[in-house]
Amino acid sequence: MRLNIAILIMIAFIILLAFSLNSPKMDQIKIGAASEKTDELFSSLIKEKEPGAAVLVVLEDQIVFKKGYGVTDLRTFNPIDSRTNFRLASLTKQFTAAAIMLLVREGKIKYETRLTEIFPDFPAYGQKITIRHLLQHTSGLPDYEDLMPPYDGQRPVEEVQIKDRDVLALLKQTSSLRFEPGTRWAYSNSGYVLLGLIVEKMAGQPFDEFLRKCLFLPLGMGSTLAYIRGKNEVPQRAYGHRKRNGKWEESDQSPTSATLGDGGVYSNLEDLAKWARALRYQTFLKKEEWDLLLTPVVVDGPGPVEPDGTPAAYGFGWFVNPWRGHARMWHYGETSGFRTAIQCFLDRQLTVIVLANRTDLEARSLSLQIASLYLD
């Protein structure tokens, strides 16, 4: 049954993409109206001197909307703009997956390489887990957040933050999996932390440096980086916030904010527009790699779901289920003080990105609200 569903999704992608070259073009009046409504939406949600968001809309290779709202923090009150860098949270996973695909292209690993081939001292169940399982969230690994001791707030959060190597150590102490690898789907931050470590080990250089040299700089994404406290600095940085008892407070770091492969990248609208262009023209990925990226995982048990439980589809680092009949690749991110989302509608050449440094803005739903203005 799940195989049939996956086949239907792939057929839908092929049919929808077949029309992409002849997709209807919006006239300037409609684009202007959609952009005006987008501006009205965010202006109504965000006051001038409070944490805010940055919003980007790219249509048919043209940036039709790009604007910042609110401020980067409550100390400097610097206004958010298109060069403000936000923690991307799980939008990072698309870059981690891309890094793995580069290593496969170079012949350094295979998608069927097993975890114990890379980490020989990993528990025996690692013999059943492949890189493909990690990419598609079908490994059965427990989430490392469930293995950590609770944070009591007695020490500064930076002193108790878990790093990627700490996650590996925790998993090595785990004697069993949540389920047999490949039999069901469960979103796994642990898997993507391990993928970052795999990149590091197989490339022979730190994960952050590999991303910068082999991915970000070649695409002109000069401000994008995997942040490591004490090693690099985030330029024009936005800090995360939450509202408590009616007042805003900085909430930028948590015990899990220092891991890289699952959520450690910072970026801005200018750089992400370049990333969207690379995706649009497939300048970074070869056709066979692109096809793999968009191929939905097939499992016998429970399959991919959206945060609200809606059935979904997942490829390599991206959700790939259509929306309102449009071929789509997308992801969302949630971490301490930040909410992020990217929506790419492949048949309409439309990309929507929302980056927020406050937790009360649901970037995923807002990005779809924006998309509907340009798709309708």
What positions do the PLM features span?
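Catalytic loop of the DD-peptidase/beta-lactamase superfamily, centered on the K-T-G motif
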Residues: 2-7, 11-67, 200-213, 217, ...
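Active-site-proximal loop and beta-strand segments within enzyme catalytic domains
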Residues: 51, 74-188, 205, 242-252
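Alpha-helical scaffold elements that line and support the substrate/ligand-binding pocket
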Residues: 55-62, 87-110, 114, 134, ...
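Solvent-exposed coil/turn segments that connect beta secondary-structure elements
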Residues: 60-62, 72-74, 139-140, 359
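Secretory-pathway/luminal and periplasmic proteins that interact with or process carbohydrate-rich
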Residues: 64, 122-130, 140-147, 179, ...
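Catalytic-site signature segments of enzymes, centered on catalytic residues
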Residues: 68, 145-149, 154-233, 257-273, ...
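Charged/polar, low-hydrophobicity segments characteristic of intrinsically disordered regions
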Residues: 129-137, 224-239, 303-316
